[in-house]
Regions:
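Short, solvent-exposed loop/helix junctions and linker helices
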Residues: 47, 121-124, 170
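Short, Lys/Arg-enriched, Trp-marked, Pro/Gly-tolerant hinge/linker segments that flank
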Residues: 116-117, 136-178
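Aromatic/histidine-rich interaction motifs
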Residues: 111-132, 138
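Short, charged, solvent-exposed linker or helix-capping segments at domain edges/interfaces
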Residues: 4, 109-114, 162-163
Length: 178
C-alpha cells in the first residue's frame, strides 16, 4: 500500500530507531514532552519504544497509522502502543502533551488489556489533572510514578471510543485520503 511505501521511506531516512521520545530512567518508567505547534505543521511517520499517550490541551490534531486515522480534540486522548508507527498533522494551533510509558511500567498495570491496541478515550477532568500532574514540578518523581501508574489504570478501564476513520485500501483513494 501507499502507507507501506511511506513507512519504508521513513524507516530508511530516519536514523536508528526513529524514536524521538525523551529518555526516562527505568526507576520512573515514564517521560513526557510538551510541544506547541502551528496549524499545518506535521510530524512524519515514526515510532517510539515506549507506549505513548497523546493529548492536546488546545487545538486539534489528525493522527494516522497504517490502517486508521483519528481526529483528536482536547476532549480526547489517544493511546499508541510501543513501536506503533504513526504520524500526525496539526489542524489548528495545538499545544500537545505526550507521555511515554516504558514497557516495564505498562506491564505493572496488569489490567491494561488494551495496551497493544491504538484507541481513543475521553479526556475526563481526572485524566486531564493526572496528565497535568506529570508536567508539574510540585510532585516528587516517586509521586509522579504513582500518577503515571494511576493514569495507566484509568486507560485500562476507560471504554475506547469508536473514533477511528479507516483508511481506504485502494491506492487512488488512499492518496486522496492522505
Amino acid at each position: 500500500s501507499s502507507f507501506d511505501m511511506i513507512m519504508a521511506g521513513a524507516k530508511s531516512e530516519m536514523p536508528g530507531s526513529i524514536d524521538k521520545a525523551p529518555r526516562h530512567d527505568e526507576a520512573t518508567g515514564w517521560s513526557s514532552t510538551a510541544i506547541s505547534y502551528q496549524r499545518g505543521e506535521a510530524d512524519p511517520p515514526h515510532h517510539h519504544v515506549e507506549g505513548q499517550l497523546l493529548f492536546a490541551t488546545r487545538g486539534v490534531m489528525l493522527v494516522q497509522t497504517e490502517s486508521d486515522r483519528w481526529v483528536i480534540p482536547p476532549q480526547r486522548a489517544l493511546w499508541l502502543p510501543p513501536l506503533h508507527i504513526h504520524s500526525y498533522h496539526l489542524l489548528s494551533q495545538t499545544d500537545l502533551r505526550a507521555i511515554y510509558f516504558s514497557s516495564s511500567l505498562i506491564a505493572e498495570c496488569t489490567s491494561f488489556t488494551k495496551s497493544q491496541q491504538v484507541h481513543v478515550i475521553t479526556a475526563t477532568p481526572l485524566v486531564k489533572e493526572l496528565i497535568a500532574g506529570l508536567f508539574s514540578e510540585d510532585y516528587a518523581r516517586p509521586s509522579q510514578r504513582k500518577i503515571a501508574l494511576l493514569l495507566l489504570e484509568i486507560l485500562s478501564e476507560a471504554p475506547p471510543l469508536t473514533m477511528a476513520l479507516p483508511m481506504p485500501n485502494d491506492e487512488r483513494l488512499f492518496s486522496a485520503a492522505r
